[in-house]
Amino acid sequence: MLGWAITFFIIAIIAAVFGFGGIAGAATGIAQFLFFVFIALLVISLIANALRGRAPKA
């Protein structure tokens, strides 16, 4: 149990360093960009599969 507590403490310290260091703002911008890129790729993939007449895999 003490091992888990130490592990989560270290993770919290690392998150605090990133959060207070200004990296979080840059990471948010990158995440938003990647989100829209992958949404566009999803739509393109769905359209391509619809034009080929294939049913989506379950």
UniProtKB/Swiss-Prot annotation:
Signal peptide: none annotated. It holds the Pfam family DUF1328. It is found in: Cell membrane. One of its GO terms (cellular component) is plasma membrane. InterPro entries: DUF1328. The keyword Phosphoprotein does not apply. NCBIfam families: PRK13682.1-1, PRK13682.1-3, PRK13682.1-4. This is UPF0391 membrane protein MADE_1011595.
